[in-house]
Amino acid sequence: MEKFTVYKGLVAPLNRENVDTDAIIPKQFLKSIKKTGFGQNLFDEWRYLDHGEPGQDCSTRPINPDFVLNQPRYKGAGILLARKNFGCGSSREHAPWALDQFGFRAVIAPSFADIFYSNCFKNGVLPIVLTEVQVDHLFNETQAFNGYQLTIDLEAQQVIAPDGTAYNFDVAPFRKYCLLNGLDDIGLTLQHADKIKAYEAERILKMSWLATQLP
């Protein structure tokens, strides 16, 4: 998992409340047995004018020119600005996978669905909760100025606007540690690899029958 320390990126405003995970990555794409390739289908039913299917070549599909991520001014955005209750609905982990693979490092909103919020941290996407007043202001700024960028300093727990205004946000110490060090669940486990190996070796000595292979 990629480390998250300080990130500066273009902001894309998604001005919709209660965006559920089926909107983020529609159900038909969950058939895949891989963890990759979901970025092209992020917000599939909003980005495209036709119905998408797994394995389809998205480069030939008709796009919805009115959808925010299809507008040239937001091309390459790495920060998604959203409204309240973002990520509600089913608990599919494919939702943060799709956001990450599209290129979003962070999502800023007044509130998130609990499971989606947790899944973001496990997959390298930083979900940031700001007040509705602060989010309203950022929407106004993003829409008023082309190329509007924000800087996110995870160590300082601040979102910094171009004029220097800093918005503080909360993050649990353990989740912050994992993102700063690029540690997912597997990475955390591997930090204790020596202890795991030592335990397994000791267990075999005490319970040798565990190592017996049946014919």
UniProtKB/Swiss-Prot annotation:
Family: Belongs to the LeuD family. LeuD type 1 subfamily.
Assembly: Heterodimer of LeuC and LeuD.
This protein's record includes keyword Lyase: yes
Gene (name only): leuD
Keywords recorded for this protein, A-Z: Amino-acid biosynthesis, Branched-chain amino acid biosynthesis, Leucine biosynthesis, Lyase
Keyword Aminoacyl-tRNA synthetase set for record: no
Species for this entry: Polynucleobacter necessarius subsp. necessarius (strain STIR1)
GO cellular component: 3-isopropylmalate dehydratase complex
EC number(s) on file: 4.2.1.33
Name of the protein in question: 3-isopropylmalate dehydratase small subunit
Source organism, top-level taxon: Bacteria
